[in-house]
Regions:
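Gram-negative and organellar
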Residues: 8, 14-17, 24-26, 30-32, ...
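Negatively charged
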Residues: 2
Length: 767
């Protein structure tokens, strides 16, 4: 069977090994080697993991090292090469395997140094080929061509040129030295496949990878014309069709990958697993996560168990295909698998040192991401903080930590962490993207624009960059705001029956970064015993937004009772830090004056001040004071305390407790509008937000609310207040956010319990 396997007939031997329950160490090594000859890299690793605690011959470890290298798991490959060399330190093939893997991992200087030591023994064609390979990876194409030329046999004809030599000539712009017509179809297909493979090398820069992929695409275009209708080139034509998927993926042409894949499926062409992974990656990047999840589940799961030989990139794509499909159990399964199968550190054979295991770090990064998207931000913060501070030199971990701080509503804390990360690699794309998001939150518009412009120029197709650019583009749009309410069945004395309250405002795009102009219209009406009250407002103003500061000044013409009067408003707030904010508002012809008062010719001016304390997304409180000076000599003082305590959170449900206290005092008593001498409300409530559907920036949720409390009014005693509410809210494509809520309330007015049934609505639209 071994002899047959060497001839290419590997299946009988593989079947025999699979049926045996007991194997010697040499037989295990045979199994590993034959599986490698069969091109079953993942099977090699599966078998090795089953017998990893046995002392295998060096050839067994070497086979596993090659399999790991084929799967681009460089560190695992290097560990196995070290094991093989510890048993056979003079084996030149093993030394070359280690050297080539070092080059793949980006350790070019170490690889060249070890190769120089190996070459010092005696000239060897294989060493020259290894040298050319390293120079090709480093971009030293002249040295690559020199080494390849030295490796050629004397008097080699063009038809005998190896694929690597042809590539070396092309890398040095010497393609004219090659007569493509004299190259065999297999060599031309090999060249195309090699270009695609090189375009995926993670140690190359993005520009290098794009340039290589462009060469592969150009070569595909030429070969496609030659072989499309040539029945003698069917095998080679099918090869380049599959490899074409990889070149398109490297160039971030995700929709082209998908359409090409669909064309191949229609022709009945078999797509190998590694090419299906390219397709799944394209679906994921094109925001079609469920299709990506379907393909990856078929590729990477054995029944319900995740394969043990996945690369870090494959694990990440599988994880995000679950997460972005809202499949949290699946994402958690990948997370647990990654953590449970990966030790924190890897020890290099033959050395006392150990190095951090990137896969273990990735697993804990998954853990924090699942917590973040499951609305468990405290756990996400704990995980990312521990990782960031235990690995201070890891920039990515600190960026992840800053992202969680930003999600918790602490942009200044996030900004500080990003400053620390900046020391390591100031122009890292992910760093600048996160800095731009923080700048947007802090209203540092110019800084956000500069950072966004830089990353868009460098990595325009990066998904994080695309998302950031979209946010900045939306910020620069005009904005329409509509808000109001309408009564359905009301008995309350303030707003009247079948009341309507509507405000529509249009904001201009940002002017000189910080300014926006706005104009709008307001309308309110209600039916009272003394007649119908109507108020119309025409308003215009300016808004200022900068770091820590928001200001808005408004002038309004208010029409009521067949006359019009000028009104004005000045509002603003200031943030001291991530936790504390103070704000105030001054208003002439205030909107705090009830509609019924204005129906009876009573107006008023008001002043308001408030303090807000924000701990995090799970707890916040605010205290406000308002004073209204009515034109009928009444003076009203109002004090309120409002808060939020999160008592439950899960991926689809959030429940908050909303304590609320309100105190009001008036100096005049006999007025045509509701005007208690003193009143005090305590009405705690609960609000539940249930996510019905979400896809990236689009979501649909429903909100339930209920509250029961008490209201005390001087001379009328205490009575019960009850509140119920149900609403829905839609967010769409970053430009629409709209909601409507049906509310019912029953409360005492001057000793009589009366009810109000009404609808509140609001919409923000960017255009």
């Amino acid at each position: 069977m071994i002899i047959e396997a060497r001839k290419g007939n590997t299946q009988p031997a593989l079947s025999w090994f699979a049926q045996k329950s007991t194997l010697s160490n040499n037989q295990i090594a045979d199994w590993l080697q034959i599986a490698l000859w069969a091109g079953q890299d993942k099977q090699v690793i599966t078998v090795y993991n089953r017998y990893r605690h046995q002392q295998l011959p060096a050839r067994g470890y070497a086979a596993v090292a090659v399999a790991y290298r084929n799967l681009q798991q460089w560190q695992n490959s290097l560990t196995l090469w070290q094991k093989a060399l510890s048993l056979e330190p003079q084996n030149k093939d093993y030394q070359r395997g280690q050297i080539l893997t070092l080059a793949d991992a980006g350790h070019y200087d170490t690889a060249l140094f070890k190769l120089k030591q190996l070459k010092s023994g005696a000239p060897d064609k294989a060493n020259l080929l290894a040298e050319a390979y390293i120079y090709k990876l480093t971009g030293r194409y002249q040295d690559e061509l020199r080494a390849m030329t030295e490796s050629l046999p004397e008097n080699a004809s063009k038809q005998q040129y190896p694929t690597e030599y042809v590539l070396a000539l092309r890398n040095n712009q010497l393609a004219a030295a090659i007569d493509d017509a004299n190259l065999t179809p297999d060599i031309r297909a090999d060249i195309h496949a090699e270009l695609v493979r090189l375009s995926f090398m993670p140690t190359r820069s993005e520009n290098e990878r794009y340039a290589i992929a462009d060469r592969a695409l150009a070569q595909y275009a030429a070969l496609e014309i030659l072989w499309h209708d040539n029945p003698d080139r069917t095998a080679q034509y099918q090869r380049i069709q599959v490899d074409h998927l990889g070149a398109l993926l490297t160039r971030d042409r995700y929709r082209d990958v998908i359409s090409h894949y669909q064309r191949l499926k229609k022709t009945g062409q078999i797509i190998p697993p590694w090419a299906l992974y390219w397709v799944a990656s394209a679906y994921l990047k094109d925001q079609q996560p469920k299709k990506a999840q379907s393909i990856m589940t078929e590729l990477f799961y054995n029944k319900e168990t995740i394969a043990t030989d996945l690369s870090d990139e494959e694990l990440a794509d599988l994880f995000y295909s679950h997460l972005e499909s809202e499949n949290y159990p699946g994402a958690l399964t990948v997370t647990k698998h990654t953590i449970n199968t990966s030790p924190p550190f890897l020890r290099l054979m033959g050395t006392p040192t150990s190095i951090p295991n990137d896969t273990w770090l990735q697993g804990h990064s998954f853990l924090s991401t699942v917590a973040k998207y499951s609305n468990d931000l405290p756990q996400a913060e704990i995980t990312t903080r521990e990782l960031a501070y235990n690995a201070p030199g890891n920039q990515g971990l600190r960026i992840d930590y800053a992202s969680v701080l930003q999600a918790r509503g602490w942009p200044r804390a996030a900004e500080n962490e990003l400053k620390k990360a900046e020391v390591i690699e100031p122009r890292n794309i992910n760093l600048e993207v996160e800095q731009a998001w923080t700048a947007l939150t802090l209203q540092e518009w110019q800084q956000a624009a500069v950072l966004t412009h830089d990353v868009v120029e460098r990595e325009p197709q990066d998904p994080g960059v695309v998302r950031l650019k979209r946010a900045v583009d939306v910020h620069n749009l005009a904005e329409l705001r509509i808000a109001g309410s309408t009564g359905i069945d009301a008995e309350g004395p303030d707003s009247g029956k079948h009341d309507v309250d509507l405000t529509t405002i249009v904001y201009s795009p940002p002017l000189n970064d910080n300014w926006r102009g706005f104009a709008g219209f307001g309308y309110a009406d209600g039916q009272f015993s003394e007649g119908k009250g109507i108020v119309r407002d025409w308003l215009a103003g300016v808004e200022w937004r900068s770091r820590n500061i928001w200001l808005e000044a408004e002038y309004a013409e208010r029409f009521f009772n067949h006359e019009h009067k000028p009104g004005a408003r000045l509002s603003g707030w200031y943030d001291f830090n991530d936790n504390w904010r103070i704000g105030s508002q001054l208003e002439r012809l205030s909107h705090r004056v009830p509609l019924r008062a204005m129906k009876n010719g009573v107006t008023g001016n008001s002043a308001q001040a408030y303090v807000r304390w924000y701990q995090n997304e799970r707890r916040k409180y605010g205290v406000s004071w308002a004073f209204t000076d009515f034109s009928d000599s009444n003076q009203r003082h109002e004090v309120s305390i409002e808060g939020q305590e999160r008592i439950w959170s899960s991926p689809y449900l959030i429940v908050d407790f909303l304590p609320n206290l309100y105190y009001e005092q008036n100096t005049e008593h006999d007025t045509p509008y509701y005007n208690p001498i003193k009143m005090f409300d305590i009405v705690p409530a609960f609000e539940a937000s249930h996510l019905l559907w979400r896809s990236y920036e689009n979501s649909w949720e429903q909100i339930f609310s209920a509250g029961v409390g008490a209201s005390w009014q001087k001379h009328y005693g205490t009575d019960v207040v009850t509140q119920l509410g149900y609403g829905q809210r839609i967010s769409w494509n970053d430009v629409i956010d709209a909601g409507a809520t049906l509310r019912w309330e029953k409360r005492p007015y001057d000793g009589d319990r009366e009810h109000n049934l009404y609808v509140e609505f609001d919409m923000t639209f960017r255009f």
